[in-house]
C-alpha cells in the first residue's frame, strides 16, 4: 500500500527493521547543537542553498485544494479500529472525554474569512514516518534517538493498528542508503507520508534528533527565527526549515485528514508552524509582548552576568525584534499557516528550550518520546489538555523542559485525543 521508493526493490511498504542492542549509557546532555561552527544549541546560521532532490516542487496552492466543501472519501475501516460513535473508542468508559465531532467547523480566531475545518475520526488508512538520528561519529553525537524510533514504532503497531508495511523508518544505523536520514530521504519520505491522504486517514510523523533555529526570512516568526531540524548530512546540504516542513506535510492535506506529529528536539515548539498553541489549561495562547519582552531583557542580564557576550547580542536582537514585529508575525501565521486539516503537534520543548537526551530504565531515550508513550500507556483515554498535562507531569519528575501542544485549527482541547 505504502509505495515508498527504495524498499523491497521499489515495491510497497517498508521492511521490518532490526535494531542492534543499544548499550546502557549514563544520563546524557541536552539534544544540544550538532553545530558545524561555534558552540551550543540554538545557534543561528543562514539557510544553505537549496538543492534539487529528484522531484519537482509543487506550485503554491490552497490548503488541500480546499473550496469549503470536504470531498467525499471511502471509509477504509481498518479492522479493529472503532467508529467515532462506538464505545470502542472509550472501552465503554462513560467518563472518558467525548470523541471528535463530525462535519465542518468554522475557524474564527482571526483565520481567513470563510474557512472551516474538519476533525478526523482516524478510522481510515494509517501511515507513519519515524526519524531517529544519533549522528554517529559527529560532534554532538546522541544516543537515544534510534531507540525512540524503535519504541515509537512498536507502540504504534501494538496500540493503534499501524502496520509495519505502512511505516517508514529512517535511522542512521541502517545499511540501506534509502533508509538513512539524509536531507533528500527525509524530504522524499515527507512527500510519501501525505500522498493520497483522504478524510479520516491518520498520519503520524516522529522526529528525534537535533533541532535549532535560523533567521526568519518571511516574517512569520514572533521571535525572528525559524525552527529547523538537522538531517544526518546537514553539514553538507544544510538543515530543513519549519516553513518547508509545513509546505510539504500540512499544506496539501484535505479537511478531515489527521497528521499527528511529535518532535523530540531542541527549539521545537512551533516546528511545523501551526498557529494555534495551547496552555495546560486548554486555553489558546496569544503573544504577550510585554511579558516576552521582559523575558528577553532577563536573558540579556543573565548572559551578561555569565560573560556570554554573544548571548547578550542575541537576546537584545530578539527583544527588539519581538517588540516590533511579534503581533504582525502572529497575524501573518494565522492568515497563512491555518489549515482545514486536523494537524496536531506535540513538541518536546518551547522554541527557546533544549530537549534532553536521557537514560531511563537503563535505556538511552529522548525525554519527550518516553513521556508521550508513558503517559498514553498509563491512560489511553485522555483529552488533549489532559494528555498535555500528563506529559508535562512525566517530564517534571526529571527535566525542566516543557512540552507544547499546537494545532492547525482552533482546537477543543476537552475532546478525546485519537490518532
UniProtKB/Swiss-Prot annotation:
Keywords: Apoptosis, Hydrolase, Protease, Thiol protease, Zymogen. This is Metacaspase-1. InterPro entries: Caspase-like_dom_sf, Metacaspase, Pept_C14_caspase. Residues 1-109 are annotated as: Disordered. One of its GO terms (cellular component) is cytoplasm. Its EC number is 3.4.22.-. GO terms for biological process: apoptotic process; proteolysis. Residues 83-95 have a biased composition (Polar residues). One of its GO terms (molecular function) is cysteine-type endopeptidase activity. It holds the Pfam family Peptidase_C14. Residues 18-37, 45-61 have a biased composition (Pro residues). Belongs to the peptidase C14B family. It comes from Botryotinia fuckeliana (strain B05.10). The gene is casA. Involved in cell death (apoptosis). It is an enzyme of class 3 (hydrolase). Gene3D superfamilies: 3.40.50.12660. The active site is at residues 210, 266. The lineage of its organism: Eukaryota, Fungi, Dikarya, Ascomycota, Pezizomycotina.
